[in-house]
C-alpha cells in the first residue's frame, strides 16, 4: 500500500503572499519572509481527510483544515497544502477547490498539484 502524507504550512504572524503561496514554495513549503519565523510549537490546527480505509489510487478524497479548539484558536489567513508520498518532495494527485472564494490551486510539478489561500481574508475552516 502506498503511504501518503498531507503537508501543510500554517503561519500566524508572518508577512506573506496575500494572494496565495508563490510557486517558489512548491518544494520547501516554508515561509521565506524576513519578517517572521516558522511556528515552533504544536499547530492549533488539524488536517483531516475522509480516507478512513487508507489511500486508493484514483479515488477522490476531501481534505479539511480546521481549528483544534475553535474557542481559543485564531482564524488563519494563509495555507499551502500538497499530498506527497512519504519521504519525497514531489506532490502527487490534483486538487479541486470546493470554495473558490477561499482557496485556489497552484501548478507546482503538474496542474493543480497544490492548493493555497486566495486572498488575505481570515478563514475559519
Where are these regions (language model features)?
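Structured recognition/catalytic domains enriched at protein termini
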Residues: 2-125
Amino acid at each position: 500500500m502506498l503511504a501518503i502524507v498531507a503537508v501543510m504550512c500554517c503561519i500566524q504572524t508572518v508577512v506573506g503572499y496575500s494572494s496565495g503561496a508563490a510557486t517558489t514554495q512548491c518544494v520547501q513549503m516554508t515561509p521565506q519572509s524576513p519578517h517572521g519565523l516558522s511556528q515552533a510549537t504544536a499547530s492549533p490546527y488539524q488536517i483531516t481527510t475522509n480516507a478512513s480505509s487508507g489511500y486508493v489510487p484514483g479515488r477522490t478524497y476531501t481534505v479539511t483544515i480546521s481549528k483544534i479548539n475553535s474557542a481559543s484558536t485564531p482564524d488563519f489567513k494563509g495555507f499551502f497544502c500538497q499530498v506527497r508520498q512519504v519521504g519525497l518532495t514531489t506532490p502527487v494527485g490534483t486538487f479541486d477547490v470546493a470554495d473558490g472564494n477561499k482557496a485556489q490551486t497552484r501548478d507546482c510539478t503538474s496542474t493543480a498539484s497544490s492548493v493555497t489561500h486566495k486572498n488575505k481574508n481570515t478563514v475559519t475552516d
